């Protein structure tokens, strides 16, 4: 069992903690999270390529995409590995969620440890919105909070 954690923060008052666990190599990764300080509704949620927050969330690079695919929904065959869809925020500005995904391993050459997780301002259109950004970012808007995924003991 490998575990990881990302503590999210932002200059806009958004905060949260995201936990990751993977039982064994080849097994899916379970992601559980708690977020607060967001506007109600769906928000794009992605693993980005870089664990660099020297310029806030802007320096985390593009969505993690080791196979060079177009942006898509979490259940699409062709998608960025880091495309985790949306998290839904309640009227109180908080979200609690669990995601199980096979494309974001903690073990092996394509591990997401050391990369960043990012919450976006707007809903992810899952690559199906017809906007010029749909196939690259899901047209999910600005980056409102992020954290580096680190190994947990």
From Swiss-Prot:
PROSITE patterns: SOD_CU_ZN_1, SOD_CU_ZN_2. Keywords: Antioxidant, Copper, Cytoplasm, Disulfide bond, Metal-binding, Oxidoreductase, Zinc. Transmembrane segments: none annotated. It is found in: Cytoplasm. Cu cation binds at residues 46, 48, 63, 120. CDD domains: Cu-Zn_Superoxide_Dismutase. SUPFAM superfamilies: Cu,Zn superoxide dismutase-like (SSF49329). Pfam families: Sod_Cu. It catalyses: 2 superoxide + 2 H(+) = H2O2 + O2. One of its GO terms (cellular component) is cytoplasm. Belongs to the Cu-Zn superoxide dismutase family. Homodimer. This is Superoxide dismutase [Cu-Zn]. The gene is SODCC.
């Amino acid at each position: 069992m490998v575990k990881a954690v990302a503590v999210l923060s932002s200059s806009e008052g958004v905060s949260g903690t995201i936990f990751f666990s993977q039982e064994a190599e080849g097994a899916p990764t379970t992601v559980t999270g708690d977020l607060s300080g967001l506007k109600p509704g769906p928000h794009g949620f992605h693993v980005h390529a870089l664990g660099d927050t020297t310029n806030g969330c802007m320096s985390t690079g593009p969505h993690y995409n080791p196979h060079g695919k177009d942006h898509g929904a979490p259940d699409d065959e062709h998608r960025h590995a880091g495309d985790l869809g949306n998290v839904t925020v309640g009227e109180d500005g908080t979200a609690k969620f669990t995601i199980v995904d096979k494309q974001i391993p903690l073990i092996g050459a394509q591990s997401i440890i050391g990369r960043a997780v990012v919450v976006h301002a707007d809903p992810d259109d899952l690559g199906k919105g017809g906007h010029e950004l749909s196939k690259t970012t899901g047209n999910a808007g600005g980056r409102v909070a992020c954290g580096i995924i680190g190994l947990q003991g």
